[in-house]
Amino acid sequence: MTADISLRPADHPAVRFGKVGVLLVNLGTPDGTDYTSMRRYLREFLTDRRVIEWSPWKWYPILFGIVLNTRPQKVGKAYELIWNKEQNESYLRTYTRNQSELMAGRLKDLDNVKVDWAMRYGTPSIGSRIDALKEEGCDRIVLFPLYPQYAAATTATVNDKAFQKLLSMRWQPALRTVPAYHDDETYIEALAASVERHLSTLDWKPEMLLASFHGIPMSYFKQGDPYYCQCQKTGRLLRERLGLTKENFLVTFQSRFGPEEWLQPYTDKTVEKLAKDGVKRIAVINPGFVSDCLETLEEIAEQAAHSFHENGGEKFAHIPCLNDGEDGMKVLEKVVRRELQGWV
């Protein structure tokens, strides 16, 4: 919509207004698997004080002296294993773009809504897409961090970056931030349907189903982060929906980094122990990841599977994330429509 300029000076610029933006935001991705791309991405990620809460005086000598000189090669090789070579990008970027495009189609009944996507680290940046939505005439924006469970290191830092952008804007759009949806019925049903659909394709039945969530340091939880509790609730609701018992369903936590104690039980150690204890068949789902990415495709589908087989396990299944499938899009659409109420 363009403002009526009939009552304004002839040299007054046209102003676009009246649209509502929806900005889907995921964690981020390097632009490539080479050293330079990986180092640039890891530097932005690991200098975020929401992610690493250590004092910079303590952390930066380690980060710039060791981590950023060794991790880019290692992480780059891991990304190469799961890189979307057809589009020369990570699958997280592919899925997030697809989710944005599909969401726009699902909201076509709302002609004043514009949908876009961004990454907290890497490109496209949150600030650049807020600018783009503002240029489209969006004076209200729903900011949707794509994390079912809230954590300061994920949801909060997305919000921080958006608020930081607003600090530089003369005419700020109104901003709504989407809360966690860890216990949403549609979300739980989508997870359960995904488990049932995938397991129905196997000629064997798992003895144990692991729900593996990304971990956070235990100290963050002790300081009041609700993430652990929300993960446990998601796990409990999923277990109950699937009709499983505590003996054949377990919530675990993966991707720990550094010397601190993280949320437990650890996924990698649990997988290894199950195999050594004689469990022969397991399946793993990642309920906290909206889209498949390095942590699911490489860390679970590759590393965890290898560990299970190396320690005596026989059958391992990784259940894909909801990604841009119909069930996953139903979940995201429900959340977006709920948050748009009063604006459309």
UniProtKB/Swiss-Prot annotation:
Pathway: Porphyrin-containing compound metabolism; protoheme biosynthesis; protoheme from protoporphyrin-IX: step 1/1. Keywords: Cytoplasm, Heme biosynthesis, Iron, Lyase, Metal-binding, Porphyrin biosynthesis. Its EC number is 4.98.1.1. One of its GO terms (cellular component) is cytoplasm. It catalyses: heme b + 2 H(+) = protoporphyrin IX + Fe(2+). One of its GO terms (molecular function) is ferrochelatase activity. PROSITE patterns: FERROCHELATASE. GO terms for biological process: heme biosynthetic process. Coiled coil: none annotated. It is found in: Cytoplasm. Fe cation binds at residues 214, 295. Belongs to the ferrochelatase family. Catalyzes the ferrous insertion into protoporphyrin IX. This is Ferrochelatase.
